[in-house]
């Protein structure tokens, strides 16, 4: 929990805002990269998790590449100083102009998610007079044991190309003159906490890579995605995810020869270093006796609870009361679903108190909106307090 001294310093900032723990971010990256380098694994940061400029500069210093899901994310990464040859670009709906931009920038690979997309990349590459590196994003039909809203690897998902369609299109893909298949990409989902899922993924990848190789594709890398979850329930108990356990599973079960193994981590890098600081506006009690705390933050700053039903630990960082009550924490947006959590046990909470909504460094600011014409939240960094 934030100390009273830190809470007092935060009082001068206009709420709501994101507070980023720079020391924890550095510790997380040091932990990740020390283990990744041990295995010679390549790491890409999933920039969709958080594109804050200050965080990107820190991440870049650790030699991490970038995983993008839009042309503007590619642009953001390049403008932040990342080497284009460390950038991979996935996404099921790449626009022509986005593909053209990626081709112009000579990024490492465009991860293609349909046969029609491969055809378009080939056409646009021909226009540019280039041969463009692509990776085949394969839908592996794996249940990642996570929230269905962030499951990307089952058979009916919009993501990736079915293995059967790739097999039926081999001759066509190999006939294209302006694309070169250099990688295989897979991503089964996000917030995965059951690590045996990664073993199942490895077994499926091994078969796919062997068959693609036998069909004549000379793969330089295998990108196994990311998806490692974080502890939203008790973030203080696990501020840094268990990268070592995931890498140990991959090392034991993934059999892809001398090919480079790439990962795409987003949530696991930045989730725990960020929290949303919001101020209590009002208290009221409904006709049914439910105690509401209305804060100046809302689903426009942090949409995950409203969108996914996601849980975030909430604390009152200014109240010193001994009495604790159960509250429902709601935001200012004109939506009934704008609820951060229900039955939250907090010390007696009054107007002006500061609450922190923890583990909000990933998919918080990057999913923020200006619905109801709300201002976008600011950012405060721990080393500047």
Give the ranges of each region predicted by the language model.
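A charged N-terminal "starter" segment
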Residues: 1-132, 174-180, 207-214, 345-348, ...
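Short, glycine-/Ser/Thr-/acidic-enriched flexible segments
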Residues: 24, 50, 73, 94, ...
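Hydrophobic "anchor" residues on beta-strands that sit immediately upstream
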Residues: 44, 133, 221, 260, ...
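Short beta-strand segments
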Residues: 46, 133-139, 185-187, 223-225, ...
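Short acidic, glycine/serine/threonine-rich loops at helix termini
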Residues: 56, 79, 99-104, 121-124, ...
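Hydrophobic residues within beta-strands of alpha/beta enzymes
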Residues: 66-67, 87, 110, 184, ...
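Active-site loop/helix belt of alpha/beta enzymes
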Residues: 141-282, 346
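Charged (often Lys/Glu-rich) extended helix/loop segments that serve as interaction or gating elements
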Residues: 249, 258-385
């Amino acid at each position: 929990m934030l100390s009273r001294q830190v809470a007092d310093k935060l009082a001068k900032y206009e709420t709501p805002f994101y507070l980023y723990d720079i020391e924890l971010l550095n510790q997380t990256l040091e932990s990740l990269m020390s283990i990744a380098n041990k295995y010679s694994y390549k790491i890409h940061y999933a920039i969709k998790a958080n594109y804050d400029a200050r965080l990107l500069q820190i991440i870049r210093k650790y030699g991490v590449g970038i995983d993008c899901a839009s042309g503007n994310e590619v642009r953001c990464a390049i403008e932040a100083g990342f080497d284009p040859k460390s950038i991979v670009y996935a996404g099921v709906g790449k626009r022509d102009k986005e593909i053209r931009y990626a081709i112009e920038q000579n990024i490492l690979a465009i991860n293609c998610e349909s046969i029609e997309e491969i055809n378009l990349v080939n056409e646009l590459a021909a226009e540019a007079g280039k041969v463009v590196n692509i990776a085949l994003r394969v839908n592996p039909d794996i249940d990642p044991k996570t929230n269905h809203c962030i499951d990307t690897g089952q058979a009916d998902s919009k993501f990736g190309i079915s293995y059967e369609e790739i097999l039926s299109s081999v001759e066509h893909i190999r006939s294209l003159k302006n694309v070169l298949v250099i990688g295989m990409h897979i991503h089964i989902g996000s917030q995965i906490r059951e690590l045996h899922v990664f073993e199942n993924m490895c077994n499926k990848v091994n078969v796919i890579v062997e068959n693609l190789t036998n069909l004549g594709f000379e793969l330089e890398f295998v990108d196994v995605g990311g998806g490692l979850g974080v502890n939203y329930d008790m973030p203080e108990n696990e501020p840094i995810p268990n990268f070592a356990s995931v890498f140990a599973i991959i090392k034991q079960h993934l059999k892809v020869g001398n090919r480079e193994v790439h990962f795409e981590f987003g949530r696991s890098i930045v989730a725990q270093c960020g929290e949303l600081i919001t101020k209590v506006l009002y208290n009221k009690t409904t006709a049914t006796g439910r105690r509401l705390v209305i804060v100046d933050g809302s689903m426009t700053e942090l949409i995950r609870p409203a969108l996914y039903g996601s849980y975030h630990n909430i604390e009152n960082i200014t109240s010193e009361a001994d009495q604790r009550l159960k509250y429902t924490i709601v935001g200012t947006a004109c939506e009934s679903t704008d609820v951060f959590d229900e039955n939250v046990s907090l010390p007696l909470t009054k107007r002006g108190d500061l609450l922190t909504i923890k583990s909000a460094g990933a998919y918080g600011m990057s999913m923020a909106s200006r619905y109801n014409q709300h201002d976008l939240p600011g950012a405060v960094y721990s080393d500047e307090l």
